[in-house]
Amino acid sequence: MFIQRTFLKVLTLLSIVTVLVHGQTQPKDKITLKAVIYDQHKFYNPNFQPKNEGEFVLTKGIVKSDIDQEKRIPVLNSMDANDSINKKARISWPDGFKYFFVDNQAGDSKSAKSGKNLPIQRDIELNWNGEAYEYSNSNYFPINGQGFNDVSYPVPRGYVPISGESWTSMSTSTSLKGNNYNFCLKLNSKFTYNGNEVFKFTGDDDVWVYINNKLVVDIGGIHSQVSASVDVTKLGLTVGTIYNFDFFYCERKTSESNIKIQTTIETYCAYVDYCGVCEGDGSTCCNPATTCNDGKRCTNDFCPDPKSPLAGKDISKYCDHIPVKTCSSKDTLCKQYTCSDDLKGDMCVIKNTVTCPGNQTNCEASGYCDDKFGCINPSKCTDYIGQCFSGKCVNGECAKVTADDCEKIIGGVCRSDYVCEPGLGCKSSERCRQGSDICDLVTCDPKATDESKRCITTVLTDEECRCCEYDTLRFCEQAACSNKTGLCQPIPKNVDDGNLCTIDACNEDEKTITHVQVTCGGCETCSYATGKCEPDSSLCNDNNICTIDICVHEGILDGLPQGNCSNTPVDCGANDEDKCKTWSCDPTKGGCQSTPVVCEDKGKCLVGTCQPSTGQCEYSDRVCDNGGAFCVIGQCDQRLGCLVFDRVCSSDNSRCEEGVCVNGTESEEGHCKSVKYDPLPFNCNTGAVVSTAVIAGSTVAGAVALGIFLYGGKKGYDYWKDSRNISMGSSNSNPLYEEQQTGRGVNPMYDDPAAN
């Protein structure tokens, strides 16, 4: 009886102390897995509730050993329905596997094999059983009466049940009718590795567990209850490091649904999405096609960032509506397109068409628009070349060729009287002309440095001068004497106009002197310097800064030298050593333009950058900013990009100590430390029996004193007060016990009636 009374007193004392020190750190009694369940139906996904043909057995190797990090879901090893593993696992529709763990509530509700599913958020609580956190349920039907199992769900017309089944009941057993057997469960979470974790699962059907993105539990297929476990300490993980923990479970066939989870892994959520799902993508309660549909085809509708604090709010008010870029991709230099929300017409319609009327200030003629080069406007002035216009534009007018221009073009020290004659071009006459006295022979000295001595007059002798006096000269002749005979020997009249591009001739019959311009074909003109047809690129000017305009000699056509215009694109950036620029030419923006090469990121966590020396894209891990705080983790997730969440520290002894994060200061770096739970759990005490120190540590003296006073009376209180400075580290330092010579401990607060 004494032992019973003493035990009851101690238990009661422990209870009071626990209440009085409420709020001090305690080891977790339970952990909550915030999962999402995807309700399935065989009408939409024939991988569920397959026919009772052949064996239903455990099947390994259905999924790949690496998780899809962008979606955080398993991936089938084979997409072949005839693959031996798929057949054994009853995966008759491999394409439907992608809907096991991904939202497809927008799937066609009227069509078979649409993959439609209904996501439902569910929590699973694992309680501490003294050795591990555990959840066990041999009748696991978490969504009975919900989803497709809801009697109000509209049954598709195409659904034909087999004997004994109905839309909401797949079991033919009376006792099991109404249970929702077809569903899949997904949990994406994290944990900080302590160095001693284990995980064990028992149940049916498919179960896959990934740790650090690697498959560690593989009990796939439709089968009866089986078990599998993993010793996390054998996975090569680093203590104190954060890893992904991903759990996938499917119930695909009647008539059992068993689940038992035992683990020492303390999972947590880096974030909870606005649907309440641990590290979810928001799809449980937000569908871009329905929740965010603004009814406009010219916008792409997106759900908000799943990390947004929108729980309990109208999510549709926070959707993103991004204008589509489909139409702008059709733009050219001549046409710009825009998107039309008018469902009756084309989606992309022309917003603007470029016209090319020509700029009068630049003497441009009306032109046309080229999709590659933009406006092509020929110069009006090129039409008048050869008609005493220079081909240049000055103040909006085509400039005429002046005498000074002609002097520059065909000038020489022995020519003068420059003039431009339409149809012929520049002309000139001899500077030193013959006078009326034929006996005075006038010549020009091109080497003379004194202009007054440029023209030289030589007086002929009477014989030389008058030898042709009595001869009759023809129109196209001029007098001249033979040096050999001294007799009259007329020579052709000099009709040279000084222009090599004219054919000078004297017509005796018509008594005329003509100067016919040399004819050239295409874009060739006669060169004043050579008198030959040569390519003239000025005739090819299209007034477009983005083309190189040149005339190319093509040969002889119809007896004439022929040139053709070539307007090739400007080679922008040809000498630019920076290969991370893309060059283009836009006449509306002043010509050559450069834009940086964009290296698209690979997924959400690899950042692309261009290397200027090679122009090649290189990729590096995305750095997520944690603000420099040690106790904040910045980590990239392939699905969602950067996540920022509190660091969860490991401890040296997870059942007796808590990992506490300490941010860095100027004098101390941030670090994790282990702090003993207060009160310390019973099994963490090193003594043989529970002590007062174990009950409440060194911070609850007042609470202990009150408890001892209540249950030990004044004698007990006085005894405690006298000994309160004694360190209590074991059972025999507990003031509730007193060491006797017999070696037995007695309670000094117990009044033995026999002693009174």
Curated annotation (Swiss-Prot):
One annotated Gene Ontology cellular component of this protein: extracellular region
Cytoplasmic side: 714-756
Disulfide bond entries: none
Biased composition (Polar residues): 730-744
Domain PA14 per the UniProt entry, residue ranges: 126-281
Subcellular location: Membrane
Domain of life: Eukaryota
Keywords tagged on the record: Glycoprotein, Membrane, Signal, Transmembrane, Transmembrane helix
List of glycosylated residues: 82, 359, 483, 564, 663
Extracellular side: 24-692
Signal peptide as annotated in the record: 1-23
Region (Disordered) residue spans: 730-756
Record flagged with keyword Membrane: yes
A family per Pfam: PA14
Segments traversing the membrane: 693-713
Main location: membrane
Membrane topology: Single-pass type I membrane protein
Family indicated by similarity: Belongs to the prespore-cell-inducing factor family.
Protein name: Protein psiP
Organism: Dictyostelium discoideum
Gene, per the UniProt record: psiP
